[in-house]
Swiss-Prot record:
A motif ('HIGH' region) lies at residues 42-52. The keyword Ligase applies. Belongs to the class-I aminoacyl-tRNA synthetase family. Its main location: cytoplasm. It catalyses: tRNA(Leu) + L-leucine + ATP = L-leucyl-tRNA(Leu) + AMP + diphosphate. This is Leucine--tRNA ligase. It comes from Azotobacter vinelandii (strain DJ / ATCC BAA-1303). One of its GO terms (cellular component) is cytosol. The gene is leuS.
Amino acid sequence: MHEQYQPREIEAAAQSIWDAQKSFEVREQPGKDTFYCLSMFPYPSGKLHMGHVRNYTIGDVIARYQRMQGRNVLQPMGWDAFGMPAENAAMKNRVAPAKWTYENIAYMKSQLKSLGLGIDWSREVTTCKPDYYRWEQWLFTRLFEKGVIYRKNGTVNWDPVDQTVLANEQVIDGRGWRSGALVEKREIPMYYFRITAYAEELLQSLDSLPGWPEQVKTMQRNWIGKSYGADIVFDYDQASVGEAGQLRVYSTRPDTLMGATYVAVAAEHPLAQRAAANDPALAAFIAECKAGSVAEADMATMEKKGLATGQFVVHPLTGDRLPVFVANYVLWGYGEGAVMAVPAHDERDFEFANKYGLPIRQVYAAEGRDFSASEWQAWYADKEGLTTVDSGKYDGKSFTEAFDAIVADLEATGHGARKTQFRLRDWGISRQRYWGCPIPIIHCEACGDVPVPEEQLPVVLPEDVVPDGTGSPLAKMPEFYECACPKCGKPAKRETDTMDTFVESSWYYARYASPQYAGGMVDPQAADHWLPVDQYIGGIEHAILHLLYARFFHKLMRDEGLLSSDEPFENLLTQGMVVAETYYRTLENGGKDWFNPADVEVERDARAKVIGARLKSDGLPVEIGGTEKMSKSKNNGVDPQAMIDAYGADTCRLFMMFAAPPELSLEWSDAGVEGASRFLRRVWRLAHAHVGAGLPGTLDKARLSDAQKEIRRAIHLAIRQASQDVGQHHKFNTAIAQVMTLMNVLEKAPAADEQDRALLQEGLETVALLLAPITPHICHALWEALGKDGLIIDAAWPTVDETALVQDTLTLVVQVNGKLRGEIQVPAAASREEIEAAARANENVLRFTEGLAIRKVIVVPGKLVNIVAN
């Protein structure tokens, strides 16, 4: 054992043994407990960032701990390799996205290996490879034939200069992010997954996931958005509309129908189009609405605008004529593209009515509260504690009573019906992009949309294309799209859209169970052996889309007979962000020039808070921007590779696990990394001194001195605490703190005789075992140096010896009138009377009770004695 701790050599040696022995490659072992631990796979952006390191270290610690519990552990890794960044990099560097992607994968894989992750690399999947996406295409064709996937027109952001569709985040202030052109709204045919058919099951089965954070389940419930309400039908006012017809709206508040004073429709609604034909101002407003955002999030914050159409509809209960407005906050793709407006009891309608001078009719009142039509108050929208007013025959009713009575009357006249609705919309997966999975459909003039037959799959994406940012490259490649119709044999055209990259990440976890399986999407036997995933780890930012789509895909695969479980992920851990200090100078144009923390010298106060900072290069001050998520834009990232090169992977892993509980943000600290490195050097020093003196014989537990019993008790307290913290609560930081406490005890422990040294041996073995999941390389070396057989990765997690925790004597504190005045040693089995007598006889206690009358003595068993005297 080398005298100095040398992480580079130690880590290389451990990793080469794991590689040679294929230590982390797993096979199905029927009868052996399985544990499938999965961290969300990365996008191969070029290099790992600290968020990746944290995510994969957490996963690895859990996987290694479960292996020590005797389970057959699967921890795979792969690459979410399709997507826009590859196209952008390709345009910038004039290189094919495939080449850029594969080079990034090679580098990032070497980085992951240097972290010492216990990954089964034989199961690696890369989503841009045809042997992966062919099964996605196969499922697409099956679902298309069943009607679970369908084609319809969808509204997209169209860049007229680049001739391409933009994602919402690529539209900046109404203009294309690359071309700067004014973006248009366009209707184009797109493919959709009918996820709404699974809405009820996706909602209900959240209740079968106790191992998921409540916050994530709430976010999904809200996204699915089940609501109870009614469809309400307003007849057209024929005189103003010019024809007979009906306007349908869905409302969760039919109880407020008596307060409806207008209706609003989307720009694309037939009533809007009809009115605009003879009204240039309205036509211009409709064009403006169509150019606006289609994102629901933007709807909430943007200014609400509307224009009267001059048309009216008839109130189904009162017969009143209600004006029809076109409004920019009504989305055509949602419900019927129309809403009824009750300004008195809906804040958005209230603002709109006040802006355009529309009537506000109060139909609910609260006792002791005044209603004002000029100022919104939160209680106007309440359901509880209010009573209907000014509602004719519906007066004096509660929410439920009014709801039931009004819906019953609507149903009786054919003007409405109860309805349960979901906020969730079908998932549009068509992307007018190149670097994605080709959609396996052939368009034939005679036969329509024809799925590519199974024997012709995969539809391979050509990999030698360099996109230029204009239009779809595939649509310019006759060699790709020209084909024969599989049904009639006539010339036909292949679909040139590719799939949303969320599709690949919706089923990768299942492919890991049988990545080389050529007989189907997954091998059902292997899928049922490993799935569901026991522990999934990833960022909270994926709470809705990725996790919802993966749950949806799991149910699709189940219904195809590919697997039998209902949910993909049994337990979910959402790790917090990695944050760091930010520093900047304000530029003349008002912008900010950000400096990396490594280039800044800081001054701290007594509590280590940064109070001043200057740039190392010029010695001049910089502004302190506070702690923010590590990012390129704020230039506050720390390169994991530089840290691994400087300190070793174990130090980085230890710091990551010690600095914060996994679900909270972790603040980067150079001092913290230095501290982690110091601690590992201490462990190494103690082990080196111990091993250098020769390995001891077996500990004789029957003849331990009291001092030795205390040391052994500290060892087994550490085992008990760490087992709870790591195994039950994922509180790795407190488990490490417990090992540090044990190290303090072991460093002070005597090594005078064979018993002392045998006890130190047990202590060091325990430190190695408890740290093995967190710092696997140094523990690999320690285990060998301590003379243990086999590898520590194959050792069992230590068990608590309950007899070691039993204390013969207890130390109790003694208080006089609540103030600490002494300590006493008493036998563990001492009676209350014996404890009281020992406390009264304590020399210091006698001094503080002299001349006082003792009124009572309170004994808290195992803790303290309090003497009350005056």
